[in-house]
C-alpha cells in the first residue's frame, strides 16, 4: 500500500465508490425509454414528454435538501439510499409495465439519481489521497460515460435476443442492488465537516 497525503490508496474501498458512478448513469435510460414506451403504449407526444419530466425535475427540487440530510446522516448512507431508490425506479417499470408505473418508476429513478449525484463525489474525495482526488474524479466521469454508452446497445440486444428491451431495467436494477451491498460491506472513514450555525 502506498501512503500519500496521509491516506492510503485502497482500491478495495475506492472500487465500490467508483461503481456508484456507473449506477449514476442509469438515469440516461429515461432517454432510451421515451421512444420505446411511446411505441409500446401508443402515447401521444404530450404524454410522452411527461416521462423525462418525471425523472429530471427532481434534481432542482431535492439537491439542497439531500445535501443537508447528507451532512447529518453521512455520505455513504445517502449514497446507498440513492442507489436503493434507483434500483426501485428500475424494477417498478420492469415488473409493472403501465404508463402510470413507468412515470412512478422514472420519478424514483430521478430521485435516486439526484441523491447519488450529490453524495458520490464527496465520498470519492474522502476515500482517495488528496493529491489523487482530481484524477479519480476525472476517472469517475469515464466510468459514468461507460454506463451511459451501454444502455442503447444493451436494449437492442435484449430486444433482438430475448424479445424484451425492458430486461435492461432488470439488469441495471440488480447492478444497483449489488453496488449497495458492496459499498455497505467496506469500512469507510468519512471526513466530517464542522457546521457553523448562524442564528438571527
State where each predicted segment sits:
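C-terminal membrane-cytosol helix-exit motif in multi-pass small-molecule transporters
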Residues: 168, 173-193
Amino acid at each position: 500500500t502506498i501512503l500519500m497525503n496521509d491516506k492510503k490508496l485502497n482500491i478495495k474501498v475506492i472500487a465500490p465508490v467508483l461503481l456508484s458512478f456507473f449506477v449514476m448513469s442509469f438515469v440516461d435510460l429515461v432517454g432510451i425509454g421515451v421512444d420505446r414506451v411511446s411505441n409500446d403504449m401508443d402515447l401521444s407526444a404530450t404524454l410522452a414528454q411527461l416521462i423525462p419530466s418525471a425523472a429530471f425535475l427532481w434534481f432542482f427540487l431535492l439537491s439542497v435538501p439531500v445535501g443537508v440530510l447528507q451532512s447529518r446522516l453521512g455520505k455513504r448512507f445517502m449514497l446507498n439510499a440513492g442507489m436503493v431508490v434507483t434500483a426501485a425506479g428500475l424494477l417498478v417499470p420492469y415488473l409493472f409495465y403501465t404508463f402510470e408505473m413507468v412515470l412512478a418508476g422514472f420519478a424514483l429513478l430521478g430521485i435516486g439519481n439526484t441523491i447519488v449525484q450529490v453524495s458520490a463525489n464527496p465520498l470519492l474525495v474522502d476515500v482517495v489521497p488528496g493529491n489523487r482526488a482530481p484524477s479519480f474524479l476525472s476517472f469517475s466521469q469515464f466510468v459514468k460515460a461507460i454506463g451511459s454508452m451501454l444502455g442503447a446497445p444493451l436494449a437492442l440486444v435484449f430486444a433482438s435476443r430475448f424479445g424484451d428491451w425492458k430486461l435492461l431495467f432488470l439488469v441495471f436494477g440488480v447492478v444497483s442492488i449489488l453496488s449497495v451491498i458492496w459499498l455497505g460491506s467496506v469500512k469507510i472513514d468519512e471526513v466530517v465537516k464542522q457546521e457553523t450555525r448562524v442564528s438571527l
